[in-house]
Amino acid sequence: MMLPLQGAQMLQVLEKSLRRSLPASLKVYGTVFHINHGNPFNLKAVVDKWPDFNTVVVCPQEQDMTDDLDHYTNTYQIYSKDPQNCQEFLGSPELINWKQHLQIQSSQPSLNEAIQNLAVIKSFKVKQTQRILYMAAETAKELAPFLLKSKILSPSGGKPKAINQEMFKLSSMDVTHAQLVSKFWHFGGNERSQRFIERCIQTFPTCCLLGPEGTPVCWDLMDQTGEMRMAGTLPEYRLHGLVTYVIYSHAQKLGKLGFPVYSHVDYSNEAMQKMSYTLQHVPIPRSWNQWNCVPL
């Protein structure tokens, strides 16, 4: 059975339920939170049953997924209370179009088995990417205080070092900066990623530092799941703590709006892990997962 959730009341009940399952539900919780705050990306939430759902999938409306090669748009966020038994639901042809290039995002590594099994049944190849998920201490305090119990937070008080404010000016990104962001984004560098970035810049709060020429030298964006993403610094401005300052400023801006603040870092990126520690972001290992699926 497949049930699209209609109306504000159902979606608010879903958000509350997902909140009780944090951090395993974080990627879906963040997405549903923004659906309930105006739904700027025009997404839908589908469950296997209601109100006692086992699995929820959030994705764009069918009419928005017209480009079979655009996995940035063809993205599904999934949370399941029963990852071992969600394969049948995820395999419903009317739920996920496995004939498209797509990506699945989840805070649950335990979904891997179901996705790998579906790859054989539906004949697509799948590549899993796993990263460290980080939740800002203030967000953890409010949504999942138990995460802070065993964590030693940085003595910095979560604040970055000061920057040269005569040289750099705190600002927001403009849609004309999308090409620059795409060029330096690990998952970007193409026309479709640039379109996705343009949409994120137009839709959600961003943060950047403008350099002496008045153009961005360091930046941070937010995607449709509410995650801070696509941070970058021009090579000649690296190692000066600018990205720490930008991410701190962006997190403050999102926090003031009442948004949950979270991000992810590659296991090999020690500089960004150190920065996350400085800013008192709480690490949740293996909790950022993405599966890129390409039909054979």
Curated annotation (Swiss-Prot):
Q: SUPFAM superfamilies under this entry?
A: Acyl-CoA N-acyltransferases (Nat)
Keywords noted in UniProt: Acetylation, Acyltransferase, Detoxification, Mitochondrion, Transferase
Query: What's one GO-annotated cellular component?
Result: mitochondrion
Official protein name in the record: Glycine N-acyltransferase
UniProt-listed InterPro entries? Acyl_CoA_acyltransferase, Glycine_N-acyltransferase, Glycine_N-acyltransferase_C, Glycine_N-acyltransferase_N
What organism is listed for this UniProt entry? Pongo abelii
User: Where N6-acetyllysine occurs along the chain?
Assistant: K16, K127, K141, K159, K183, K256
Residue list for modification N6-succinyllysine = K16, K127, K141, K169, K183, K256
Where in the cell is the protein located? Answer: Mitochondrion
Q: Which reaction does it catalyse?
A: an acyl-CoA + glycine = an N-acylglycine + CoA + H(+); benzoyl-CoA + glycine = N-benzoylglycine + CoA + H(+)
Q: What is the enzyme's main class?
A: transferase
State if NAD is listed as a keyword: no
Gene3D superfamilies in the record, alphabetically? 3.40.630.30
Q: Which domain of life is it from?
A: Eukaryota
EC number(s): the record gives: 2.3.1.13, 2.3.1.71
Q: Which residues form the signal peptide?
A: none
Q: Which family does it belong to?
A: Belongs to the glycine N-acyltransferase family.
Q: Name one GO molecular function term.
A: glycine N-benzoyltransferase activity
What this chain does, per the entry, is described as: Mitochondrial acyltransferase which transfers an acyl group to the N-terminus of glycine and glutamine, although much less efficiently. Can conjugate a multitude of substrates to form a variety of N-acylglycines, thereby detoxify xenobiotics, such as benzoic acid or salicylic acid, and endogenous organic acids, such as isovaleric acid.
Q: Name one Pfam family in it.
A: Gly_acyl_tr_C
Instruction: Cite a single GO BP annotation.
Output: response to toxic substance
